[in-house]
Amino acid sequence: VAPTGRKPKETSTMADLLTPLSFAGLNLRNRIVMPPMWSGQAHPNGSVTEKIIDYHRVRAAAGCGLVIVEHSFVLPRGRHSATQMGVHSDEMIGGLSWLASAIRAEGAVAALQLSHAGSRASSVVLGTRPAAPSAVRHPYEPAGDIPDELTPGQISETVAAFGDAAIRAREAGFDAVEIHAAHGFLLSEFLSPLTNRRQDEYGDSLEGRSKIHIEVLAEVRRRAGSGFPIFVRLG
């Protein structure tokens, strides 16, 4: 209640939630967004299954304006789990196209989240140690592996992989991509001084720790084109 005893003026209502929204070339039927939520139902090679398609189709049919499909690894070494979706290979495009088509057929806009798990990956899944900004065990994974520190060359390969993944998403028919830089995954690890102890151009200062984010965003924009919407989940 306002100091005068009057209720503060409402600038929006729940009714706005159901009104259309247009931005960045996207036209949403409403403002309801399904965020990326891992379903854990991909094939062992990371490809899309009927269960994943049905899972997202139902949410789109329920009325979501935008469906952001669950995190999908851009490199095999960035895989978080054995049942995670992948966008690391052209072989994934066929299944991804079925998924995007199913979402769009129900009237929703379809986006795909691109990710690399960093040290939140596991040697049990990968068959090798995970890779991260520094050889530091992730605080979210106290029993996890101590990762290998990425070399500058491997960082460049990772940046390029995000660009490759964005092209695959676009070719598969997705309307947008989201870069996953949250939840303690690789890009989030680079940003935090707890997990980034580097003293080179990719560490040491906030400017250095955020360098890879700028490079990934620039590469995705370069590869996907100027008119393709890009979201960034930062955390």
What is each residue range found by the language model?
Residues 115-174:
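Non-globular sequence segments
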Residues 53-75, 171-176:
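Catalytic domains of carbohydrate-active enzymes, especially glycoside hydrolases
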